Amino acid sequence: MRKLMLGMIVSLILLCLTACNPALDSDTEQPDETAQIERHSNEGHGIPWFEGSVAEAFNLAAAANKPIFMYWGAVWCPPCQEIKHTVFKSPEFIAQSKLFIPIYLDGDTERAQSVGEEFGVKGYPTMIIFSPQGEEVTRIPGGIDISRYNSILLSSLDTLRPTRMLVQLALNSPDQLLASDFRQLAYYSWGQDFEALPVGTDPILFSQLAERVSNQDPEASARLYLQYLVMLAAGQDEAKTRQKADAAPLTRILAAPELIIGTWDYLAYYAIEIASVLDLDALALARLQNQWQQAMLDLRHNKRLSTAEQLAGWFPYLGFYFDGDATPATLPTAQITAIRLDA
């Protein structure tokens, strides 16, 4: 189990970075609301957020043959603020918003929570693309840079191939997957949709997908392999025998700055989990962890990363530093100073 006794410094980082859990509890006090989805003019200038109800938005999408972009957020959610001040203000996203019906849902309202329950929303921010017929196409994760976000969005809008269909193809007819399908699977928000995969899906599926696309799309391959490691780690508690995975693909990722940026969310938020399933002896694992944390710290000020993701560059260092310590040591003064400057 992770044992991070990081005091006030890491509490600040966690406040800025942790994906927010939705308050889908009907007993909690809710703010006043209207029956309409209100226009949020300050949440992204130039985006024509739909002003009617969700049902009206789906009816309009069907009539106009336009897909739907549905966003759940909350004013108190730091990652949501990052999305609003980066993605929603980018000229690319504003231009793309003319291609779909954009819906903004304030997660603190009872109506939004009801819609969230209907579509299985597990946390904030959540962004889902629906086809004009109302079928869910994909869920886009937070924690990726703006250029990648916009390219994934545009690709999903172009193909409108539902992720659940792609999963079935991956399981049964992988030769029928398109290049864009691999990228959609690689950038799907798996952690926010527990039903996208059939129950009991073997994590090895993602390793196999990573191998298939390794030459034509190294970034998608890297993300798919890291998803394999995350799923492998998640299933270890239930497994009778503990499985170990090849560390070579991760080593190659950590040696390529562009791949590090492209897999930043995995490398930052799942460091402990991924490291726990690598087939390495203690010395080799320590070397890889050193390479991992140094690579993230070296790139944390990359301009393509949001402020929150730049701060997340500290997670591997902090996680490896404190992991397993019954009585955690004090962080070096130089690192405390650096974290404070970044925050």
Predicted features and spans:
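Hydrophobic helical h-region of N-terminal Sec-dependent signal peptides
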Residues: 6-14
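C-terminal motif of bacterial Sec signal peptides marking the signal peptidase cleavage site
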Residues: 16-19
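Bacterial signal peptide processing site
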Residues: 21-23
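Thiol-based oxidoreductase modules, predominantly thioredoxin-like and allied folds used
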Residues: 47-52, 72-74, 86-112, 121-124
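A short beta-strand-turn-helix
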Residues: 49-67
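Short active-site neighborhood of thiol/selenol oxidoreductases, capturing the structured segment around
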Residues: 64-77
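Non-catalytic, surface beta->alpha helical segment in thiol-disulfide oxidoreductase systems
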Residues: 122-162
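Oxidative protein folding and maturation machinery
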Residues: 176-343
